[in-house]
């Protein structure tokens, strides 16, 4: 299978990131979907856009679903109110659906029990802010009194809203190794997990294990890496990190997602962060208090 097919399969089978009610979940919907060849990949460097492409392909191949619109912007009197990720008619349930999509990756910097203790790798994104926007704004678009007449004028119905959440939470290395996971009640207990650590501690992890480590480009952040794919990835040399760890020319002077491989199989993945990133992340979490 190609990476795209693996990612399509991952989208279908990976656990939800959030704990969703049956009413909100897309699980029943996706149980009718199948991975077919012919994915029309439009090159992008934005993982969220790629995630939308995967969803659009899966829904287009499902006979019981009719696509009304994807990425429909709501513009009223030159003001943009938001965007509907996916509007679909489900012929099995005779229901018009508004589906929102979210693929997110957060690192635990606080104690972990609050959404605000989790920050994105770029530091601009924080879990509590995303959660609030998703449920208070994006999923509520069709209920907005200003937008209701606009939808009617477009002859668009919304009977039910659903959300598809995928992604991974990254725990401090020690917690990850001991399987001591503390996460918010809004999170699905079966969510995908990874670790994070500093470059200095990561160098010691490399030396103490037989795992080969590779840098993961963003387009490899979804499905597990296969043995055939490692030839396309950059191998992290433990000696180079120890010798050149303070040289700004090297990859490891910024945050990177890495994957550990053994005998052609993915063992674990995580983020390796700089000291500067960690200080900024702590300040980002503290600002929520």
Residue ranges, per PLM feature:
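Intrinsically disordered, low-complexity Ser/Thr/Pro/Gly-rich regulatory segments
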Residues: 1-289
